[in-house]
Amino acid sequence: MKIEKSQRNLEIDRSRKNDFLYPLIFREYIYTFAHDRDLNRSILLENVGYDNKYSLLIVKRLITRMYQQNHLIISANDSNQNTFFRYNKNLYFQMISEGFAVIVEIPFSLRLVSSLESSEIVKSHNLRSIHSIFPFLEGKFPHLNYLSEGLIPYPIHLEKLVQILRYWVKDPSSLHLLRLFLHEYWNLNSLIIPKKSISFFVKKNQRFFLFLYNSHVYEYESVFFFLCKQSFHFRLTFYQVFLERIYFYGKIEHFVEVFTKDWGDSLCLLKDPFIHYIRYQGKSIFVSKDTPLLMKKWKYYLVNLCQCHFDVCFQPQKIHINPFSLYKHSFALLGYLSSSSVRLNLSVVRSQMLENAFLMDNIMNKLDTTVSIIPLIGSLAKMKFCNAVGHPISKPTWADFSDSDIIDRFVRICRNLSHYYSGSSRKKSLYRIKYILRLSCVKTLARKHKSTVRIFLKRLGSELLEEFFTEEEQILFLIFPRASSISQKLYRGRVWYLDIICINELSNHE
């Protein structure tokens, strides 16, 4: 009985009705919606070189060509003889990938909404981003012994990606069209490699291929998550309902509800999982307080699991196991810019576990992210916004653009940096970076009009500088609803953004 129950828990919830998505591919509004969404979303990457080519005429031509082909009988071997692929390959493929990304996300969005409603997750204005805190670094940070990191295995063949989607999208026509385009246009070696992943996402449709990649990784992680859950003696409501683990009172309130039901059994709920798992920037990171022997056993177990069950390439020699003490003062592997960008502070919270019982002081770790000024100045210098010591300079390559375009480019970079570091507690360095960008913008405009900075600022007034502030406020107003009860101070608080994917040298205009 216990084995059957475990097998049911291991099964992924795929009991949904069939999703017939293929007819939506021939709908004109799908491509219009995909294009508009890419223009309006707030991300750190630029939409490179595609806006000028987009038009409804091209969309209609694309749909007409697709209607003329019978994709149900086309295979990857004879796609070279297909007339559909003879003209505008890159443009057609990018448009179809954008449309397919919108269509294939529909069933997943419906599942997400239903899961949120069933779990009654509390809504919070405090959003998270790539720069937020990993949960295990707060409570269990001093007690972890070993850390193992390695690249996430990738499928040997493109067909594996299509087979994974078969579990979720049960529409043969859509999957056949997806298989056709993957075989025709894409090379597996450039699909999932960390060194080129950022440039790939910039040049191609990042949402589409990120969806394929996450689908693959989800299958790989599903077995591991099942094993992690078995380490608890009792089923526990995880703290994922709290978007920020520094909300200590929220955790205490939930703990009291469990604690008052059964004092004896609840003691077992305090048992920690045997291993902590993080997926970050194409890496699998395992942190545990086990012995080195147990960590090695887990290493080879995961290697055999991936090679035998998922048919993926997982090389054991590329998985490194080191004492966690080596990483306690350096968080480079977690994506932070340097060891100085993370600070470990102790917060004391006084709580009362039971009514009329004793009071106790709970000491918890709180990690604060800071803005590292030296790496940011290095990035600005590399992009020719300032020199090596941080003095602003003009950007000659942008002098040929219009004034509004130049200002928009600088404002966009400032907004991206504000989004990325908006959850940091100390932002003085961020204000200095904004000052460098503002002055670089003024120098670029003065260079274009063959004037000095002083004369140009005197003629333009303070309107230019206001652009760098009002743009950020408008973004924040879209997240937090305006109300009389919400003070302006709320907009200046720490905000995590969910839509940040990566930061690629601040901008990608060239």
Curated annotation (Swiss-Prot):
Record bears the keyword Chloroplast: yes
Keywords for this protein: Chloroplast, mRNA processing, Plastid, RNA-binding, tRNA processing
Function: Usually encoded in the trnK tRNA gene intron. Probably assists in splicing its own and other chloroplast group II introns.
One GO cellular component, as annotated: chloroplast
Single GO molecular function: RNA binding
Coiled coil location: none
Pfam families assigned to the protein according to its UniProt record, in alphabetical order: Intron_maturas2 (PF01348), MatK_N (PF01824)
Family: Belongs to the intron maturase 2 family. MatK subfamily.
Name of the protein this chain belongs to: Maturase K
Keyword tRNA processing belongs to the record: yes
Organism, scientific name: Populus trichocarpa (Western balsam poplar)
Any one of the GO BP annotations: RNA splicing
Protein's gene: matK
Subcellular location: Plastid, Chloroplast
